[in-house]
């Protein structure tokens, strides 16, 4: 599962979602991408399951870029524990998704295969997404 090796602070404050993501909203590496429409918390297991679906369909033909990494710790207190006594221990790591963020990028494959792979991967994610592609201007 994805987790950071070292953090400046062991526990963070609660994540607040912003309106729209200006950073990471365009394609940087590949020709096709999966863009988030909604906002949610994304953990390492969800990223890994989506990556497995994409690599199963694309195989070794194309290149996959993952643009998100769960680096925010999520704390949780054990069950049957009374309130108080400090913040709970770190349970998992998340990434806060804002609308407009590109999560995965694909290159080196044809459009139909890329669309199939990214649409199947979107079923593994807890928010709605859309398929985007790089627009090329030829004169």
From Swiss-Prot:
The keyword rRNA-binding applies. Keywords: Ribonucleoprotein, Ribosomal protein, RNA-binding, rRNA-binding, tRNA-binding. InterPro entries: Ribosomal_uL16 (IPR047873), Ribosomal_uL16_bact-type (IPR000114), Ribosomal_uL16_dom (IPR016180), Ribosomal_uL16_sf (IPR036920). GO terms for cellular component: cytosolic large ribosomal subunit. One of its GO terms (molecular function) is tRNA binding. GO terms for biological process: translation. CDD domains: Ribosomal_L16_L10e. SUPFAM superfamilies: Ribosomal protein L16p/L10e. Binds 23S rRNA and is also seen to make contacts with the A and possibly P site tRNAs. Part of the 50S ribosomal subunit. Belongs to the universal ribosomal protein uL16 family. This is Large ribosomal subunit protein uL16. It comes from Neorickettsia sennetsu (strain ATCC VR-367 / Miyayama) (Ehrlichia sennetsu). The gene is rplP.
